[in-house]
Each structure stands twice: as C-alpha cells, then as structure tokens.
Amino acid sequence: IAELVQFANAHNSHVHVTVNMLPHESDLDGIEEYLKTLDSIGVHAIIVASPSIMMLAKKLGCKFEVHVSTQHSSTNSSAARFWKEKGMDRVVLARECQIKDIRSICEENILPIEVFIHGGMCISFSGRCVLSNHMTLRDANRGGCAQSCRWKYHLMDGETELSDPTNLFSMSSKDLQAVDYIEDFIHMGVASLKIEGRMKSAYYLATVVSSYRMLIDYIYEHGHADVEIIERVKKEIAKAENRPTGPGFYNGLPGYKVQLYQDHDETVTQEYVAIVQDYDKESQMATLQVKNHFMPNQDLEIFGPHIPSTIVHVVDVYDSDKNVLEVCNKPMQIVHTKWSGPIEIDAMIRKIR
C-alpha cells in the first residue's frame, strides 16, 4: 500500500483503502495499529462500515478522510446529516438509491456524495447478505462473499422440481451499468463515481475505467453527452463485460428484466492478448508481453491511457532469439513485432472476436 500511495501521489491520484468489514469481537485486535500504519504511509481516505472503526480513526487523529461505506446502506439526506455530525468526510450511497433520491441528497449539500456506476449488484441490501455464510462458512460482511446468489440451483416444491434441469435456477441480478446517468450525476454535483474493482482483472478495469473517463471528459468539454458518445462508451465497456448489465435501481425498483433467473453466457466479446512493454520509434519494433493466445498476421485492437481503441494489423512476430513465431501461446513470453499504428508503454492489445 505504501508503494501504491507513492505511485498515486506522483500521478495526481488518491488511494482509498477499504476497511469496511463488520468486525466481530475477535477482529478488534490490531485495528488500531492498522489505522496508525495507514495514516503513517499517507493513504488519502479509508472506506468504513463499522461505526466503531469510524470513531477510532477520528479519536486517533488520523489525517486521512473517513468515508462511510455503501455497506452502511445510507439512502437519504438524514443519514448524510447524521454522518456529518459524527465527523465523517464523505458518504458512499447505497446502490439501492434512485436517481431522484440522489439528486435530493446532493441538493442538501451536506457531505460529498459518492455513487456506484458500474459492477456487481447484491441480490440483498449491499453487504447485508448472509447466503455465503450459510453455504460456505465465508462471511460476506468480512470480505469473504462466495457469491452464492450466482450459483445454479435445482428449484424444488417438495419432491417436484420446478426448474428446468438443463437451465437451472439462479437468483442474481444483472451488473450495474450507469452510462446513461453520468451526465445527471455530474450536473447534480456527485463528488465521486465508483467502479467496482474487487477480484477484477487489470484488463477489465482498464477497459471500464478508460471508457467512463472518456465519457466524463466529453461531458466536461461539451456540457452534455450525445447519443453517439453514449453508444461508443457502451460498446467499449461491452468488450470487457462477461455478465449482462442494467440500470440497477436508478430508474426505480427493478423488475424481473434485471434479474438473472437462469443460466447465461459469460463470454467477453474480446480477449486481452498482450501488453506493450517497449517501443523503438526508429525501427518501429514493439516489445510485447503475451497474456493470451493469438496468431500473427491478424487484426488486433490496441488501447491505452492516451490512445483511443485502434485496429492494427500485426504481421510477423519474433521471440527474443529473433525466431519467427507461428503462434503466440506462452503467457508472459516476450515477443517483438513491427507496429504501424498508435502505441504507448502499458497499452493493452486485444483480439477481436
């Protein structure tokens, strides 16, 4: 975490550490020392669900901000006012809030407000589910959720099976995707937009974060989001999604169309195959690290922090001994190829399905 804080400071970014478990008595030992350590290395904020940890951080005089976690299910301005009185610095609203409620809370201007815009949705109130506790003995409220709601079940009525044995019952919801609401959030004064990153790959995060960043920058430049940019961003995000998405609760109480009652395809439309490690402008040779199987002499798509998604035709690919490769299928292998399109260090390359 200390190394991450140094990196973030050098890139004008912040590090917020989740300390949002609901601690049982046996978990209390070491929390004070942990908070002091986080403070000493300069994290910018902690995200907390337990009032005991919130109060401890304030009592210790920690320099970082204390943000109320979404797991506290804050859904109204009275809750925000309560947390302000307790000295909290920001509230991450419950994912069960509707757009109209978020607007009303922001209009009160009580505390900076943070909302979720992308990622998994709990079938129960966020962070309040105990399915995982019962099914796997893993405590969902202490970082151990096994996502039991996404398992496939035989739905029984006594001895009679109601589910289709070839398409078993599930009880999870579609993931949240709030592209259509980003303009609203910006104009109503939401302080921070939150993307779920727990257990996600670097490729997923790079794709989703860069897509929303593109949309946010467009809105700040033009004052609004038109249909073209909305569809472009949705198309980009879909390249990393492996679950159906929907608006969550933002339109109101979700109906059956945002629930996933049966099996569904979880295949992404594009596959992350390499990352750029180096590039020689004079020879136009790119050095890549292989991540997944791909073939030379095909079209690939590159994207990075400073370059838009661009299709580039890749010709011959060589290993470190300058041998021509017929296939790139060794993860972490370093390969070289002539590159004719835009490129930058750490840009990601994906296969087009």
Question: Where are the regions that the model predicts?
Answer:
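Alpha-helix capping/helix-boundary segments
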Residues: 52-53
